[in-house]
Amino acid sequence: MKSSFKSEYPFEKRKTESERITEKFQNRIPVICEKAEKSDIPEIDKRKYLVPSDLTVGQFVYVIRKRIMLPPEKAIFIFVNDTLPPTAALMSAVYQEHKDKDGFLYVTYSGENTFGSL
């Protein structure tokens, strides 16, 4: 999935920023979170996050749900490099495995109505 953050900022600028962030906040992870192109759930109000390294994927999903004010009947899925990370995985482990060359972890979220509408 193509990141609009990557297309807006040149590689060197992104790399410099992620290095500055990881030096200043050593136990935090720089994450870029963007909505999947064809998803029908709301756009997120900010896409750059500084996530505690001991946060689980499930806890991060909860943060995203709250930020986009997603109703309980809607499901949300997050993808890292087009794969669904395990809910119990630590964000630090996901970061180590999937971080981009620029130092950011790119997360895409998507949703679907799992319960249907009445």
UniProtKB/Swiss-Prot annotation:
Compartments, as annotated in UniProt: Cytoplasmic vesicle, Autophagosome membrane; Vacuole membrane
InterPro entries: Atg8-like, Ubiquitin-like_domsf
Protein name: Autophagy-related protein 8
Site (Cleavage): 116-117
Organism: Vanderwaltozyma polyspora (strain ATCC 22028 / DSM 70294 / BCRC 21397 / CBS 2163 / NBRC 10782 / NRRL Y-8283 / UCD 57-17)
This protein's encoding gene: ATG8
Lipid-attached positions, Phosphatidylethanolamine amidated glycine: 116
The keyword Flavoprotein appears for this protein: no
Any one GO molecular function term: protein tag activity
